[in-house]
C-alpha cells in the first residue's frame, strides 16, 4: 500500500522451479508445480492478514504470446478463497475470481454456495487474452475466465486462502497448465519467474506530524499499484504509540454471515483488524470477527497497547470491564529481517472482504486517500473520506491517551 520502491528480497532464492522446453501441444506435456512456497505474514509485506495464505505464479507473457492458462483443482476448505490476476510490471490488478463466483465442474457443487457433505468438488478456471475464441475451449465457462491484454509483459496469478483447515485448505494446490490461445491445445506450462509481489518492500516509516495526534481517524486505503486484493477494501490509520500510551477505538463491525447459504448478498464475508509496522509493512498482530463474541449491531472496542507498557496488566484488567472489547499488544522491540526494530510507528488495518456497496454503511462507498506521506493532510472531503464521519457508528475513530488517563477514566 505504501508507494515505496521495492527492495531486494530473500524470497527470490526460494522459488525453485523446473525448467522446460517449448512444446507444440502434440505430446502431452508433464505437469509442473509452479506455485512455489507458501506466503503469509511471516514472509510477505503490504500488511497481510495473519489468517491468510498466498501462493504466487508469474510467467512472461511477452515470451509466451500465444499461451494462456488452465487452472483446475478441488475447492479448498476455507472461510474464503480467490484468484487475483496482476500485471507484474506495475502491480495493478487486472482481473479476479471469488469463490462464490467460480462455477463447479460437471457433477460437482460449489461448497461456498451451499452446505454439502460431498468431497472432491472440482473447478476449472482459465486465464485468456482478451479476444480469445472461447469455442476453442469447450470446458471454459464465461464466468470462470479471467482476461489479460496484449500490453501485459508479465502476468502474476495469486491464490489466496483465508482460515483454511490446514496450510493448503485440505486439498492439493490447483494444477496449472498452459493452453495455446490459437488452437486450444494443452501446451507446456511456461517457466515461472520471480514475481514482484513476493519481493520484500520497505515501508513509509518516516515520522509525520499527524503521528503525534491524539485523535486518530480511519480513512479508506486506495487500491494502489502493489498487488492489492481485488476482493477486499481496507480502512487504515497510522500513528506513533509509545510505551506510556493506550490507543482505543469503538465501532459497529460490518455484519458477516454465519452460514454458507448467506454468503451471497452478505454485507461482507469477513472482517479483521491487523497491526503492522510502517518500517517494513509486515503485520504482527491480528484478530478476526469470530474471535470476539458480540451482538450484531453493537459496538466493539479495540484497545492497542505496547507489550512493554509498564502498566500493561492494569490496562488488561480495565479492558476486561469494557463490553465486547479486545486488547491487541504491539512489541516495538521485535527485530525484522533487515535487523531493525519494527518501531513504534504503526498502521492499523480494518479489512472487509467482499463489502456490499449497496449497504449504506459500507466502506466500499467511501472515497480513498493516498497512503503515502501524511495521509491526513491530503483529506479533501471529510464527509466521504473520514470513516467516523462517512459511516457514523460503523466507522472507527482512534483516541490516544496516556496510560494514566486511560486507567483513571475507568475508575
Annotate each language-model stretch with its function.
Residues 27-411:
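A compositional/structural signature for long, glycine/proline-rich flexible linkers
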Residues 1-18:
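Sec-dependent bacterial lipoprotein signal peptides
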Amino acid at each position: 500500500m505504501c508507494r515505496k520502491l521495492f527492495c531486494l528480497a530473500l524470497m527470490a532464492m526460494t522459488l525453485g522451479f523446473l525448467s522446460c522446453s517449448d512444446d507444440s501441444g502434440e505430446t502431452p506435456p508433464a505437469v509442473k508445480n509452479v506455485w512455489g512456497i507458501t506466503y503469509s505474514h511471516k514472509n510477505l509485506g503490504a500488511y497481510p492478514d495473519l489468517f491468510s495464505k498466498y501462493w504466487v505464479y508469474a510467467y512472461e507473457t511477452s515470451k509466451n504470446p500465444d499461451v494462456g492458462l488452465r487452472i483446475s483443482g478441488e475447492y479448498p476448505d476455507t472461510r474464503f478463497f480467490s484468484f487475483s490476476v496482476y500485471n507484474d510490471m506495475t502491480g495493478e490488478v487486472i482481473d479476479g475470481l471469488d469463490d462464490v463466483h467460480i462455477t463447479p465442474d460437471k457433477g460437482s457443487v460449489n461448497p461456498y454456495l451451499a452446505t454439502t457433505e460431498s468431497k472432491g468438488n472440482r473447478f476449472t478456471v482459465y486465464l485468456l487474452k482478451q479476444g480469445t475464441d472461447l469455442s476453442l475451449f469447450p470446458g471454459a465457462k464465461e464466468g470462470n475466465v479471467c482476461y489479460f491484454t496484449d500490453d501485459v509483459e508479465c502476468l502474476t496469478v495469486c491464490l489466496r486462502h483465508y482460515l483454511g483447515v490446514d496450510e493448503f485448505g485440505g486439498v492439493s494446490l490447483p494444477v496449472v497448465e498452459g493452453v495455446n490461445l490459437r488452437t486450444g491445445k494443452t501446451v507446456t506450462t511456461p517457466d515461472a519467474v520471480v514475481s514482484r509481489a513476493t519481493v520484500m518492500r520497505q515501508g513509509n516509516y518516516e515520522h509525520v506530524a499527524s503521528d503525534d495526534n491524539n485523535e486518530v481517524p480511519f480513512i479508506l486505503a486506495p487500491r494502489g499499484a502493489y498487488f492489492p486484493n481485488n476482493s477486499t477494501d481496507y480502512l487504515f490509520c497510522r500513528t506513533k504509540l509509545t510505551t506510556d500510551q493506550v490507543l482505543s477505538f469503538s465501532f459497529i463491525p460490518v455484519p458477516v454471515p454465519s452460514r454458507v447459504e448467506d454468503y451471497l448478498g452478505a454485507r461482507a464475508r469477513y472482517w479483521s483488524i491487523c497491526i503492522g509496522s510502517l518500517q517494513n509493512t509486515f503485520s504482527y498482530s491480528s484478530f478476526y470477527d469470530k474471535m470476539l463474541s458480540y451482538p450484531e449491531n453493537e459496538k466493539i472496542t479495540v484497545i492497542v497497547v505496547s507489550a512493554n507498557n509498564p502498566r500493561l496488566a492494569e490496562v488488561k484488567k480495565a479492558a476486561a470491564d469494557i463490553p465486547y472489547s479486545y486488547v491487541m499488544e504491539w512489541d516495538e522491540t521485535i527485530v525484522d529481517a533487515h535487523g531493525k526494530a519494527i518501531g513504534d510507528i504503526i498502521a492499523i488495518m480494518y479489512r472487509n472482504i467482499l463489502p456490499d456497496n449497496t449497504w449504506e454503511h459500507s466502506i466500499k462507498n467511501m472515497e480513498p486517500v493516498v497512503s503515502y506521506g501524511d495521509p491526513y493532510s491530503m483529506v479533501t472531503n471529510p464527509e466521504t473520506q473520514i470513516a467516523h464521519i462517512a459511516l457514523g457508528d460503523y466507522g472507527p475513530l482512534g483516541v490516544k491517551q496516556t496510560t494514566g488517563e486511560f486507567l483513571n477514566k475507568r475508575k
